Amino acid sequence: MIKLNAKKIGLICLASALLVQLVTAVSLLSYSYRTKAYAEKNGRIINLACLAYDPYSPFKGRYIRLSFEEETISSKNLDKESFQNPKKHGEHYYFRMEEGADSLWTVRGIRKDLPKKESEQAGENAKGQAKSIYIKGKTYPYMLYASASETIHATFPFSEYYMQENYARYVDTIKWEDFNALKPVLSLYVDKNGQCIQKGLTVLSGSQRVSIEEYCKEKIKGVKAQ
């Protein structure tokens, strides 16, 4: 029988933990690559208008916390199919998104289940992009046969946007109202199951829309030049 001392056992446990982390990281990278490729090939990239999450402390650590206009939904803008099933508090649902003339996407329907056929999920518009795309999220609070005057609250799992440390520190110096005045937009890759991966966060810089990273880079460069 092979006897292992405490040091060897510790090394084995450490190696096992590192292996699990490595496998997890590779799996996530593989999923991200496949989702990006699928979304680009099938025109499944959407843009959501967003704001700083907390007017007093909108940024924390190395990420920007965001809220989205589409988290507050007027039921009068939803299709009839949205109200066929009782909606329970905090459960996952699929939100049918449509693109507007401003290239921003809005919620036009809510489903308990994702349509089984991809052809039922989305057709194509003149640009070759999907007319409707479903994304996964939750509804708060109850949404049981809401009337047209009611507001539905939703939450989505992509509200934290991570940044490099130096950019995050600069963003932390921006007042929330000034940040929101930049009209931030979060772009997402969407897979066929409604799961989303962040493509990037953009803001207005003059009349041009640029990535938040590029915006911070130029602002930091300007401060250093003074």
Can you say where each PLM-predicted feature lies in the sequence?
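Structured domain cores in non-transmembrane regions
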Residues: 72-145
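Short extracytoplasmic
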Residues: 45-78
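A mature extracytoplasmic/lumenal domain signature
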Residues: 52, 62, 70, 99-101, ...
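Short nucleic-acid-contacting surface segments enriched for D/E, G, S/T with interspersed K/R
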Residues: 59, 82-93, 173-185
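Extracytoplasmic/periplasmic terminal helices and flexible tails
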Residues: 106-109, 127-226
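Hydrophobic membrane-insertion alpha-helices, especially the h-region
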Residues: 11-31
